């Protein structure tokens, strides 16, 4: 209860089966899973695999073909690459969310110095999502803990740069970033 799926009997069963599978295969390292998030159908355009393939969104079917992902991908981190792929196969439907994204793109298009500064910091992060998943499953090695510290440290100047903007969408983005001060301090003490 409380995850917005109470009325979705089949969804609850599917989520339970997925958690059971993870528990069986990951040796009970699923305690980090604390929430269930539902992808709302009215927020995204839903496309089947046939449509995604025919539109060549992520992979080209031709010998010398180029997918839309290949054309657009100028990401500088694995996280950005995954996000762009997700955005292409699950495009937004809600006008406000689309406008927020466009406002961010417009801001960084007209403020190249700010964009360059963020790119440098994002490059320092590496694959923060992967590192976090390793922490959650207690499979992180010392070298990766050092990389985690670098990644979390890179969030601080990103928040500062975004907070200096007068763009509401950028300010909203800044408010969602957490440099995890307590975790960074704990890593420093190791």
Question: Which residues fall in each region the model found?
Answer:
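Charged catalytic and DNA/RNA-contacting regions of genome-maintenance
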Residues: 1-107, 116, 120-123, 127-136, ...
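Short intracellular "coupling" helices and adjacent cytoplasmic loop segments at the cytosolic face
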Residues: 111-112
């Amino acid at each position: 209860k409380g995850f917005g799926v109470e009325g979705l009997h089949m969804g609850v069963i599917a989520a339970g089966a997925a958690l059971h599978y993870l528990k069986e295969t990951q040796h009970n390292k699923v305690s980090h899973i604390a929430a269930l998030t539902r992808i709302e159908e009215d927020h995204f355009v839903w496309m089947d695999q046939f449509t995604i393939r025919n539109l060549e969104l992520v992979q080209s079917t031709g010998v010398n073909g180029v997918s839309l992902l290949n054309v657009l991908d100028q990401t500088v981190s694995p996280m950005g690459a995954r996000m762009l792929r997700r955005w292409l196969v699950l495009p937004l439907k809600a006008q406000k969310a689309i406008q927020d994204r466009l406002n961010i793109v417009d801001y960084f298009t007209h403020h190249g110095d700010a964009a360059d500064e963020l790119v440098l910091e994002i490059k320092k992060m590496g694959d923060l999502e992967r590192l976090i998943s390793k922490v959650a499953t207690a499979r992180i090695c010392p070298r990766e803990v050092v990389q985690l510290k670098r990644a979390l440290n890179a969030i601080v100047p990103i928040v500062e740069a975004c907070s200096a903007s007068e763009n509401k969408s950028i300010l909203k983005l800044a408010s969602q970033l957490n440099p995890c001060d307590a975790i960074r301090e704990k890593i420093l003490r190791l």
